[in-house]
């Protein structure tokens, strides 16, 4: 983790918020947004917030000062963006339910269809809306450098995007104004630079008839060490080659919220079975499912690897899932019931994926404003939230 992030988190008072709680540092969030805005200024590209990664709409007014709009994965995300985030509203889905499209065309600005057949099916609905909606198609260049197959949109047999052999010719894309590719996950500008030639090799004949190209998400633009200069030069070179009339879009989700917040949790009990096990009021399964899906071991403020410090514990969640385990950590001081912990970098792909498995309470949502020192609890969850999603 970057020194800037650690210093900011160390200054937080964990006792000022409920437990468990997602706590967003608004100063860090704004720093990320400024980096993204600088890319827009240097390249003319437009950067959209991908709501699938971060959708805490209480922070949309801040983010909207810097970004050009939102991109959604379906009707409900699109509605959230339309309601709370000024700017462009984009939507893509692997397959749109027929009932959703008449709703979407009432307010979205861009629709990316996954296949020519989806475009042909809903083309008349778009036209009947009477609104200017720019439509495109997601394509699959069949090239990616994603390490984890579960996150690889170009894996063999992927449903995400149309491969070149499934497009009969330019006439199949008649009426479409954009090409959308998403091939990356937590990667640098060098990967985009290596991917674009594969995109051009397969889809160059269609580019001249387009008004925009969307390079998708997975761009780790706010990660320390990310080569922003290379990203900008890559975008500018593409526009120089294919025409400055082409609007370029990027739609990161993680890059907006990367290293902006923590998950505050509390030790409930310590049990022993071969080693001390600290049971927390949070859950890997319900509150941070990527730790099990990827899997990965989240960092914790002040903690080290097993055996690094004097006191080693296995940290586990409070659900009945035997594998609801966060990992093994060591601490300079013993943990006791009531000890509060800060799991680092827990803003993205957490709130949007939380569940109430076992009836476990969803973490509260709070923010910290460094300019004033204010802690604001935005939302607490309870029994009604659990009950209402079940009937």
Where are the regions that the model predicts?
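Feature marks short, surface-exposed loop/turn motifs that line or immediately flank catalytic pockets
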Residues: 143-145, 185, 221, 256, ...
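Glycine-rich beta-strand-to-loop/alpha-helix junction loops that act as flexible
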Residues: 183-184, 213-222, 252-255
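Short glycine/threonine-rich loop-to-helix capping motif typified by GTGT followed
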Residues: 188-194, 222-232, 258-269, 328-331
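Charged (often Lys/Glu-rich) extended helix/loop segments that serve as interaction or gating elements
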Residues: 247-391
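Active-site-proximal beta-alpha core segment in soluble small-molecule metabolic enzymes
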Residues: 45-212, 226, 241
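Acidic/histidine-enriched ion/cofactor-binding microenvironments in catalytic or ligand-binding pockets
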Residues: 201, 207-210, 230-237, 241-243, ...
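N-terminal capping/small domains of soluble enzymes
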Residues: 6-86, 92-96, 283, 331-344, ...
């Amino acid at each position: 983790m970057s020194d800037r992030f650690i210093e900011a988190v160390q200054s937080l008072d964990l006792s000022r918020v409920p437990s468990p709680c997602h706590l967003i540092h608004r100063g860090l969030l704004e720093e990320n947004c400024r980096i993204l805005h600088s890319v827009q200024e240097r390249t003319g590209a437009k950067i959209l917030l991908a709501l699938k990664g971060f959708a805490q709409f209480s922070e949309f007014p801040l983010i909207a000062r810097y970004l050009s709009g939102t991109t959604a994965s379906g009707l409900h995300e699109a509605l959230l963006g339309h309601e709370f985030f000024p700017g462009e509203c984009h939507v893509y889905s692997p397959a749109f339910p027929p009932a959703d499209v008449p709703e979407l065309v009432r307010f979205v600005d861009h629709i990316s269809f996954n296949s020519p057949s989806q475009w042909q099916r809903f083309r008349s609905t778009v036209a009947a809306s009477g609104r200017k909606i720019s439509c495109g198609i997601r394509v699959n260049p069949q090239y990616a450098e994603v390490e984890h197959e579960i996150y690889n949109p170009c894996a063999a047999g992927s449903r995400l995007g149309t491969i070149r052999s499934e497009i009969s010719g330019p006439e199949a894309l008649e009426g479409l104004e954009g090409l959308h590719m998403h091939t990356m996950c937590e990667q640098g500008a060098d990967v985009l630079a290596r991917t674009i030639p594969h995109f051009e090799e397969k889809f160059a004949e269609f580019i001249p008839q387009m008004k925009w190209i969307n390079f998708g998400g997975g761009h780790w633009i706010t990660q320390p060490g990310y080569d922003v200069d290379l990203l900008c030069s890559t975008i500018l070179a593409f526009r120089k080659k294919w025409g400055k009339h082409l609007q370029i879009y990027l739609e990161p989700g993680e890059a907006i919220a990367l290293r902006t917040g923590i998950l505050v949790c509390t030790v409930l009990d310590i049990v022993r079975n071969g080693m001390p096990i600290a049971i927390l009021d949070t859950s890997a399964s319900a509150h941070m499912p990527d730790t099990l899906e990827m899997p990965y071991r989240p960092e914790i403020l002040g903690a080290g690897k097993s055996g690094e410090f004097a006191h080693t514990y296995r940290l586990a969640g409070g659900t009945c899932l035997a594998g609801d385990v966060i990992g093994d950590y060591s601490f300079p001081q013993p943990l006791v019931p009531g000890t509060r912990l800060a799991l680092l970098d827990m803003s993205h792909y957490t709130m949007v994926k939380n569940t109430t498995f076992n009836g476990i309470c969803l973490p509260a949502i709070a923010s910290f404003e460094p300019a004033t020192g204010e802690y604001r609890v935005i939302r607490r969850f309870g029994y009604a939230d659990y009950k209402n999603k079940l009937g």
